[in-house]
Amino acid sequence: MQMQLNAKTVQGAFKAQRPRSVRGNVAVRAVAAPPKLVTKRSEEIFKEAQELLPGGVNSPVRAFRSVGGGPIVFDRVKGAYCWDVDGNKYIDYVGSWGPAICGHGNDEVNNALKAQIDKGTSFGAPCELENVLAKMVIDRVPSVEMVRFVSSGTEACLSVLRLMRAYTGREKVLKFTGCYHGHADSFLVKAGSGVITLGLPDSPGVPKSTAAATLTATYNNLDSVRELFAANKGEIAGVILEPVVGNSGFIVPTKEFLQGLREICTAEGAVLCFDEVMTGFRIAKGCAQEHFGITPDLTTMGKVIGGGMPVGAYGGKKEIMKMVAPAGPMYQAGTLSGNPMAMTAGIKTLEILGRPGAYEHLEKVTKRLIDGIMAAAKEHSHEITGGNISGMFGFFFCKGPVTCFEDALAADTAKFARFHRGMLEEGVYLAPSQFEAGFTSLAHSEADVDATIAAARRVFARI
């Protein structure tokens, strides 16, 4: 299904809403016009960027292709808020796509980074900070006995792909339709995130041989997994998945699904990897695997563990991790891996998250937010389904339930585009795609949430 909105759809989505009055003999309630959003400087900067950067951005979803209009160009962020170059202030539910769990520009994180700058930003050599953060990760994450730091979530995922193959001696890997594990070749087959947003089934440039080694099953459907294992007996190195999908929108697994995957992988001699780049340390102190009580063999991480700095990590059983060079034969390296700035920000972020009440706050404000948005939608007869786990949430404009990518395709993307624009006009910044999860932070207050719900109610009244 083509997910990119065409020009006609977008134009219709943003057509001025005239106040309702009496039409024929039917009285229709008048609706207040939306606030005027001035974006002149954003438009100027983006116009110049299109001559300098492919599509004017450095990551596709930022271009607002699926919601229409031009992207908002930011000037600064702090706490739960962001300000654009035109001076507009927004309550932010993107959070730099997940890392800003303590709030933007957290003072404790900033002070730690400022102190580290004077000592050095990159050594290209071991530093004790790597040990400190590694111990924190190992202490909290059930599956991790040893960890390797890298510089992005994509790097972490492509590394575990190679590791699964090296450990098992097999070539094929199984993933799930709509799950996104970065932009490595093997993961761009029926992927999520910006790949869905742009309406791309796959990406040009991926060799057919690579695509052939990537098997795709249906999320929350164990039969589809069993069928692929039966058809590829002894050939599947491992299974990788988002334990909570955040790159096809917000999709929650059943406990039976995750438990079934654990049992299948154990029986088939395949490696089970949870991609916790998004969920790691966000939905629980010990990540999604702690929340659901299912322990994978390998885990990828990112976002939160860098506290806003570029970072990634992968870890798991020592038996498997000792395959990684220089301990073993599977080669992987990185110039900025384990750099002191990322380690410093990660240490302070995990320290803050380890304090009493942190995850209770995330659950409280996020549940209040999603319940309020859905109630506001239903007040104005809009079909909606959604939910949250701790500081991660999402909703779809459809009846639901949404249990897999195929269900998500039923969502009304044109309505989401109108809603997104309306919320921007009301001073609320949501992810510019129906197919991305949203995030709250420790900096979000109940007042922020209530203001957001009130804004949603006004927008639902006029779309």
UniProtKB/Swiss-Prot annotation:
CDD domains cross-referenced by the UniProt entry: OAT_like (cd00610)
Q: What's in the GO CC field?
A: chloroplast
Quote one Gene Ontology molecular function term.
pyridoxal phosphate binding
Q: Where is the transit peptide?
A: 1-30
Asked whether the keyword Plastid is assigned, the reply is yes
Per the UniProt entry, the Enzyme Commission number(s) are 5.4.3.8
| Main subcellular location of this protein, as a coarse class | plastid
**Family that this chain belongs to:** Belongs to the class-III pyridoxal-phosphate-dependent aminotransferase family. HemL subfamily.
Subunit architecture: Homodimer.
Kindly state which keywords UniProt assigns to this record, in alphabetical order: Chlorophyll biosynthesis, Chloroplast, Isomerase, Plastid, Porphyrin biosynthesis, Pyridoxal phosphate, Transit peptide
Reactions the enzyme catalyzes: (S)-4-amino-5-oxopentanoate = 5-aminolevulinate
Identify the pathway. Porphyrin-containing compound metabolism; protoporphyrin-IX biosynthesis; 5-aminolevulinate from L-glutamyl-tRNA(Glu): step 2/2; Porphyrin-containing compound metabolism; chlorophyll biosynthesis
PROSITE patterns per the UniProt record, alphabetical: AA_TRANSFER_CLASS_3 (PS00600)
List the HAMAP family.
HemL_aminotrans_3
Top-level taxon: Eukaryota
In the record, N6-(pyridoxal phosphate)lysine modifications are located at 303
* Protein encoded by which gene: GSA
Question: What SUPFAM superfamilies does its record include?
Answer: PLP-dependent transferases (SSF53383)
Q: Which NCBIfam families match?
A: hemL, PRK00062.1
Cofactor requirements of the protein:
pyridoxal 5'-phosphate
Classification via InterPro entries: 4pyrrol_synth_GluAld_NH2Trfase, Aminotrans_3, Aminotrans_3_PPA_site, PyrdxlP-dep_Trfase, PyrdxlP-dep_Trfase_major, PyrdxlP-dep_Trfase_small
Q: What is this protein called?
A: Glutamate-1-semialdehyde 2,1-aminomutase, chloroplastic
